[in-house]
Regions:
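Basic, glycine/lysine-rich polyanion-binding surfaces/domains
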Residues: 1-174
């Protein structure tokens, strides 16, 4: 889900638990949406892109988030909610060699801190790769257009062969 407009930070800030203002370029922050009774509805990570916030939900939660955000944009707010789920594909790359594999695909990951992202290309396809907090090793989420998803997956898989990359369903682990 993307949130555009001058009020994007304030809207997310007032509707969730974390401070969502004054974010650096490509910085990501986790936040939680709760009910009036303090029950957790969803945990998301919002990344500050050039002209919008890219909000990554838990699997299957994007329709709820889109509707929730749209219901809470008030008169005077400068905001527009766009659900890009149908046009994008998300995959993961995890493990000790994840950084090396992405670098071999042409993604300059050195210097990308945890909870930050980078725009790049893999096999001439535009991607946005976000470094998640390390669980046991390097952990990346890679978003690309659906039409480029197979090409990106194949390029990552090919680069990973020398490093023991093993695909695991919709996610790629090594």
């Amino acid at each position: 889900v993307q949130l555009f407009g001058k009020s994007r930070y304030e809207i997310l800030n007032r509707m969730s638990t974390n401070k969502m203002v004054d974010m650096q370029q490509d910085e990501g922050r986790a936040t939680i949406f709760i009910t009036a009774n303090a029950r957790i509805i969803d945990r998301v990570v919002a990344y500050n892109r050039d002209d919008h916030l890219l909000i990554l939900t838990e699997p299957g939660r994007n329709p709820w988030l889109r509707d929730f955000l749209q219901q809470n944009v008030f008169f005077g707010d400068d905001a527009r909610v766009v659900d890009i789920t149908a046009e994008t594909q998300m995959s993961g790359l995890h493990g000790a060699n994840a950084d090396v594999i992405l670098q071999e695909c042409g993604v300059p990951v050195d210097g990308v801190q945890a909870m930050h992202g980078i725009s790049s290309t893999i096999a001439d396809a535009t991607i946005y790769a976000v470094r998640r907090k390390e669980i046991s090793n390097h952990h990346w989420q890679i978003m690309t257009g659906k039409s480029d998803a197979a090409t990106v997956y194949e390029a990552i898989f090919e680069a990973g062969q020398a490093h023991g990359l093993v695909p695991a369903g919709g996610l790629t682990y090594n």
